[in-house]
Amino acid sequence: MTLAHSLSFPDSLRDGPTVGDLGEFEVIRVITEQAGSSLNGDDAAVLRHASPNSRAVVTTDMLVAGRHFQLDWSTPEQIGQKAIVQNFADIEAMGARPVAALLAISAPTHTPVEFVRGLARGMNQRLEEYSAELVGGDITSGDSLVIAVTAIGQLGGSLPELTLGRARPGQTLVAHGKIGYSAAGLALLQHFGPDNVPEHLRPLVDAHCAPVLTPGRGMVARAAGATAMTDNSDGLIVDLNQMAMKSGVRIDVDSSSISPDELLSEAASVLGTDAWRWILSGGEDHTLLSTTFGDAPSGFRTIGQVTKTRHEDLVTVDKKTPAFSDGWRSF
């Protein structure tokens, strides 16, 4: 058995041709049918700037089957939604507006065309929320199933981009979105499998398989005077550590502002674990984390303060060493 054929797709996707049966151009046609664009079809896409002083913001991220998603846990649509959100969150974290995406797929020849169709459909669902388009990409055969998305955003106006190194003492730490939900959903899937998760805990699983990001929050924060921003992809403490290190500051998180809600507490009770691990080190929520002077921007809530107080940790919780500080590792 080859490595490629060790990748197993759900039975529900197998009724029909494979990508090997159709070939490259027919598979591309399947994708564009689900996520069409007037800019897609030439050797490259030409994007117009929204205004003369607009700047381009570009990022890329990959999802690897068995590493970032499980085919028996997530539908193709959910995988497509996740691929867009994790990239667009990086664009939002710069204070920019996502406008386009490119999709590159490396897939075994036995990959069902129905998987690719569902993937593109899920991507388009998230793209439409942003009025963005899939403007091109590439597909090739390979032993592993790898999905790579390049996201393109536009940064208008004269305000600076929201980099990691612009947090200053005296500023407020704010957040938009749930924290700990994705990690809790993953833990539930690992324990129960995809079909036996208690129904009232399904929102946590959904947060892991198909995260949601409210469009435009990064732009709102930038317009309101935000300085530094990132998204919670690798774990709250890990991501805030990067911000603190690059800004040369300390960040103290207020535990009462991020304490486990009823859903997280119930999941932790069911699994016999500590919900704080999910909150502090879980990641993949793609919650926007920002620093700002004054009140939290619309849609954000205050969760801490930026200080210059000496402490052995760059990031503290209630001015103490965090109980959990590990996070996602790529290697």
From Swiss-Prot:
Protein residues bound to Mg(2+) 2: 61, 90
Any one Gene Ontology molecular-function term assigned to this protein's record: magnesium ion binding
Binding site for ATP: 137-138, 233
Residues that coordinate or bind substrate: 68, 284, 328
Entry keyword set: ATP-binding, Kinase, Magnesium, Metal-binding, Nucleotide-binding, Thiamine biosynthesis, Transferase
One GO-annotated biological process of the protein: thiamine biosynthetic process
Binding residues for Mg(2+) 3: 43, 90, 231
Alphabetical list of Pfam families matching this protein: AIRS (PF00586), AIRS_C (PF02769)
PANTHER family hit by this protein: THIAMINE-MONOPHOSPHATE KINASE
Entry similarity comment: Belongs to the thiamine-monophosphate kinase family.
Note: Reaction mechanism of ThiL seems to utilize a direct, inline transfer of the gamma-phosphate of ATP to TMP rather than a phosphorylated enzyme intermediate.
UniProt-recorded name of the protein: Thiamine-monophosphate kinase
Gene: thiL
